[in-house]
Regions:
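Short, small-residue-biased leader/transition segments that mark boundaries at the very start
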Residues: 3-8
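Transmembrane beta-strands of outer-membrane beta-barrel proteins
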Residues: 28-30, 46, 60-62, 107-111, ...
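Membrane-embedded beta-barrel scaffold of Gram-negative outer-membrane proteins
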Residues: 53, 59-61, 88-140, 147-149, ...
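C-terminal beta-signal and adjacent terminal beta-strands/loops
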Residues: 119, 124, 156, 196-203, ...
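Residues that define the transmembrane beta-barrel architecture of outer-membrane proteins
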Residues: 10-12, 42-44, 90-94, 136-142, ...
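Outer-membrane beta-barrel "beta-signal"
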Residues: 51, 95-99, 147, 251-264
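Transmembrane beta-strands of outer-membrane beta-barrel pores
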Residues: 12, 32-38, 64-70, 77-79, ...
Length: 264
């Protein structure tokens, strides 16, 4: 006869953070969080950074932070793909970013360089049909963004990211490029964008590695009926691309839907 045992685990956490303007061009951010788990133990999670306020609304930031997360009850015990042997994930993140504005604030731009070193990142492996720890990860890359407000009706935005992975991460792309535009006119609003994804890892299982590349076009239109309601129609993957984010699970082709939003 099988006997059931009740597993009781306690957890508490606390944090403190502060921001101090050292002078007109330099600010300091610092903080620390303590996370105690009766099964895993106590973990200190610090972060800190400097922000340099430059002329013409430009800003340079440097930051170092630690990330830490215990597996949840759902990930460990509830429904497939549960795994009771999951370990806590942790990582160190180093970032250097620069942001600025031009044309009287009509144009904004930014670039971000980062390096991540982590261990035991929790992910779902479709081939094994369960949650697993990925082992060690070491990633670095760059992210850029650009926004331009043409006039009170039109706005354009674009972003690009490049990611180098020493150890491939499931569902992470090497290149991602997006360009879109937004239009508003009285009660109407319209937004559309095209996204190009290259080198997305759909499977990282040894011997079954697989990558995908695809282009997505999405569109959304809204009409405000009154102060608390609007109707919308949106289309996703309008180019009807065949692609997967996780191997063995194809994403829908062209999808169109509409509805009413009511806000109270």
């Amino acid at each position: 006869r099988r006997q059931r045992q009740m597993c009781i685990r306690d957890r508490f956490a606390g944090y403190v953070d502060f921001r101090q303007d050292i002078n007109s061009w330099l600010s300091l951010d610092a903080g620390v969080r303590i996370d105690h788990h009766s099964h895993v133990g106590t973990e200190w999670i610090p972060q800190g950074g400097l922000a340099f306020h430059l002329p013409r609304q430009a800003e340079l930031k440097a930051m170092v932070s630690k990330g830490f997360r215990n597996p949840t009850i759902r990930e460990m015990y509830m429904f497939p793909p549960q795994n009771p042997d999951l370990k806590a994930e942790s990582l160190m993140n180093y970032e250097l970013s620069f942001t600025g504005q031009l044309l009287g604030g009509a144009m904004s731009y930014g670039v971000n360089l980062y390096y991540i070193n982590g261990d035991n990142i929790i992910m779902t492996d479709p081939a094994l049909r369960k949650n697993v720890n990925s082992g060690e990860i070491e990633n670095w890359g760059v992210e850029t963004n650009l926004g331009y407000r043409i006039n009170r009706h039109w706005q354009m935005n674009a972003n690009y990211s490049w990611l180098h992975m020493e150890n491939p991460v499931l569902a992470a792309p090497e290149h991602k490029l997006y360009a879109g535009t937004d239009f508003t006119q009285r009660r109407w609003s319209l937004s559309t964008g095209i996204q190009y994804v290259k080198g997305l890892h759909t499977s990282v299982t040894p011997g079954k590695e697989k990558q995908e590349s695809f282009v997505l076009w999405n569109l959304r239109a809204n009409y405000r009926l009154c102060s608390f309601a609007d109707v919308f129609v949106k289309g996703e993957n309008l180019l009807a691309q065949r692609y997967e984010i996780n191997a063995g699970f194809p994403m829908p082709k062209a999808t169109v839907m509409g509805g009413v939003n009511i806000n109270f």
